[in-house]
Structures are given as C-alpha cells and as structure tokens.
Amino acid sequence: MTLTSFHPGQVWNDTNGNRIQAHGGSIITVDGVYYWYGENKEFTVPGSTIWHWGVRCYSSTDLYNWEDRGLIVPPVEDDPEHPLHPGQAVDRPHIIFNEQTGKFVCWIKVMSKGSLQRSTVLVADDILGPYEIVQTWLRPLSMSAGDFDLVVDPHDGKGYYVFERVHSELIVADLTDDYTNVTGYYSTHFPQPQPPFVREAPAHFYRDRKHYLLTSGTTGYYPNPSESAVSPTIHGPYTVLGDLHPTDASRTSFHTQISSVFEHPLKKDLYIALGDRWLPTYLDDGDRAHRAFEEHFAPGRDGDVRMEEFAEVNTSRADYVWLPLRFEGDRPVIDWHDEWSLDDFEDR
C-alpha cells in the first residue's frame, strides 16, 4: 500500500511490508534522495541478549514510503568484545557528510556494563557503505559520552559533537576537520545533579540564525517531558524555552523520545521531529517513571529501589512518531496529529 500521509504512532512498514527498523534514527539527503537510518532492533526481545542487529537504512523520495536498503553497519557476530557485537549496547547512530574529505562519517554510542559509554567512529565513500571503523572505544574529552547529535554548520562546514556527559550535563564539542574526533574545545550546558533531571537525547537544528536543542529527561525507555532551548551560537549560552509539548497532559512528549530533527529541503519552515515510541503499550503518564528514577538515583542510594517494571521492555515492537514543529515566536511547539501531510506546508 502506497502511503500519502504520516500516521504518528501507527505501525510503519517498508515497501516490502516489513516493520521498519531504524530506531534512534535520523534522515540525511543525498542527491535528492532521503535516507533514514537507525538501530535495527528486530531481534531485541525480552530475555534476549541481543541489543541490536546493526544499523539499517531505508531510502525514499517522498518521506512516506521507504525501501529497505539493508544493513549499512552490520553486527560483528563472532567477537563478544567487539563494539559492534549484538550483545553490545549500540545506540543512536548519526551520519554527516564531510565536504573536504568526501566521506560520510558515522558515530555510534556504545554503552558498556555499568554507566561507561563510549563511541565508535566509521567512514564510507557512499551513504550505503561499506563503512570502515577508524575509532573504537573512544572517550571524547576523556568523558563517558551518552546520547548525542552531530552538527555541521551550514555556513562554514565546521562540525560539532553534542552529547550527554552521562548523568551530569550536556557538552558541545568541536570536531576535527575530518569529523572523526574532537579537538579538545568544548562548552557545558544544563548541569543537573542526577537522573531523571539530567538532559539527554539532544536533537539540534538551525533556524533563523539561531541554534536549537531539544532534549529529554533521563528515564530509560520510559517517556518524559521534552524541553527546548535556543542560543545565538552553538556553544551558547542557551535560553531554556520550556516544555516542547505543552498540550500533552500525560507529560510524556506524546509517549515519545525525539531522536533528531529534519529540516525539509523543499518546504518552507518545515522541521520534523523524528521520535521513537519505545513502549507502544505503555500508556501511563510520565510521573510514575519519573519518581522511580528520581528515587533510584538519589544520593546515598545503592540501587536497591525496585526497577524491574522499567527494565523489561520489547523494543523490537517500538513505533515511530514524526510530528512537525510550529513556532510561537522563537519557541518551538509540537502538537498532536493523528494524521498529517507534507501538502499542509508551502513549497520553498
């Protein structure tokens, strides 16, 4: 069935009729074709030791109908210590194109047992690969680096790595000219004492000469209120603008965590928030999970708070919620739509 509109939160199949597996995903445009890539979670079910099955990519010319282009970063099955082994917690791949080197550069977060999180960096001549690993177990700035976004300045091509310093604050770091490492220069933002208050899952976009960051709180796969902030420069200072979903009474960002923001190249002022509904059957409000995580990470606690309810999830069945941003002055806002279309927006 050919789609002609978006249906947020509904099961989204590819052109072969299979459930799309591109979680924690982003879109990159290459030669007029859209490529949506993300974590392949098809085998990540409760009781499984499989966290991921590589990075899968899809292509489209209309953003509605997606052709499966396969695994652009396959799992490494025969080495449990390899960062791409299916048992490693591979999350949130991001790919940017380097005009100077002609390479596509992919960063992937890998979370080890405990709280240490590091990065693997790969490069390719084509968006579909093959990708060659150039960095493994990288600790940018000697920090434990969690959820992140990669940013290319639209004016000078300079690259930035925006990441959560785990359970602490948000970092904006300059990338090297080839985008495969950090230079050492960075700025810090939104310091918080502990989850669930720490901001994670940063999604950057640029509009009207301003830099925006959308972030979530830290409650695992359980959704919580998203927050927006704006700055005249990528290194800040950022002004917090408040809840991104002010009409959502559940305080769960419409049961979604945003992974990236896509600026449509052919539509005027259309920015699409790409989100994962990690837990389609979890319809509770966000306060219960928020309280559980706050207590679990409280100073002096040693992890003895019961968290089983918030640990056993089936991300193989996660859905997607794509919604357009609208702006009240400088403030981005997301409203719920059961269905929406690109035809609702003016052409450039």
Q: Over which residues does each language-model region extend?
A:
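Carbohydrate-active catalytic/glycan-binding domains of CAZyme proteins
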Residues: 1-348
